[in-house]
Amino acid sequence: AYKITDGCINCGACEPECPVEAISESDAVRVIDADKCIDCGACANTCPVDAIVEG
C-alpha cells in the first residue's frame, strides 16, 4: 500500500484520484487506508510535493 509522508501539505489533490476512496483527511495530513489501497499509484502521480510513497 502507498503511504503519505510528513511532506504532505494537505492540499487534497490526491483524494479525488483514488479509485477506491482509500484517502481521507486527518488533522494535519491526508491518510491512506492500507486495507482499501489497491497499489495503483494514482495518488502518488498527482501529488504536487511527492509526499506519497510506496510501502
From Swiss-Prot:
This is Ferredoxin. It comes from the Bacteria. GO terms for cellular component: cytoplasm. PROSITE patterns: 4FE4S_FER_1, 4FE4S_FER_2. Gene3D superfamilies: 3.30.70.20. GO terms for molecular function: 4 iron, 4 sulfur cluster binding; electron transfer activity; metal ion binding. Keywords: 4Fe-4S, Electron transport, Iron, Iron-sulfur, Metal-binding, Repeat, Transport. Its cofactor is [4Fe-4S] cluster. [4Fe-4S] cluster 2 binds at C18, C37, C40, C43. Ferredoxins are iron-sulfur proteins that transfer electrons in a wide variety of metabolic reactions. The keyword Isomerase does not apply. Residues 2-27, 28-55 form the 4Fe-4S ferredoxin-type domain. It holds the Pfam family Fer4_9. [4Fe-4S] cluster 1 binds at C8, C11, C14, C47. Binds 2 [4Fe-4S] clusters.
